[in-house]
């Protein structure tokens, strides 16, 4: 990748590196594109950390477990729609770019994979005063799908 002056390979723990600072230093604070093959067991924390930290992201293209990619792009009323769908779609427009079957890997995993591109909205679809409260409410709502929510579930 050294032949490209607009590509940086960053070999760091994405949950520990200050990507806002890195984007400022390497790209003058302009929006960046992140491309990664994420560890499947921490996909959601990584993606949400990138969005919630307000790193100047233009897009995020990642390989994830297929089931997770389907949940990210699921629409209301579908069985895959949940807290992850709502959270991702609050920040970005998801697009399933490719399915990657298990036989593409050695050793062959027991799960399918997918490449999903999340194109960040310039402005979120709705304006809220307290995003932390919004996401607590979303998590509580989907954790209690068949139960009635009470005030203690959210606060």
PLM feature spans:
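Catalytic cores of RNA-modifying enzymes
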Residues: 1-140
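Short amphipathic alpha-helical/adjacent loop interface patches that line ligand
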Residues: 146
């Amino acid at each position: 990748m050294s032949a490209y002056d607009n590509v940086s390979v960053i070999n760091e723990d994405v949950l520990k590196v200050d990507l806002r600072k890195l984007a400022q230093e390497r790209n003058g604070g302009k929006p960046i594109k992140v491309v990664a093959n994420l560890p499947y067991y921490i996909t959601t924390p990584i993606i949400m950390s990138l969005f919630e930290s307000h790193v100047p992201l233009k897009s995020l293209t990642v390989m994830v477990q297929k089931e997770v990619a389907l949940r990210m792009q699921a629409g209301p009323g579908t069985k895959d729609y949940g807290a992850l769908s709502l959270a991702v779609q609050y920040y970005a427009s998801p697009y399933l770019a490719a399915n990657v079957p298990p036989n593409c890997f050695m050793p062959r995993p027991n799960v399918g994979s997918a490449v999903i591109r999340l194109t960040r909205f310039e402005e979120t679809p709705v304006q809220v005063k307290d995003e932390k409260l919004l996401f607590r409410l979303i998590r509580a709502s989907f954790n209690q799908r068949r139960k009635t929510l009470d005030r203690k579930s959210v606060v």
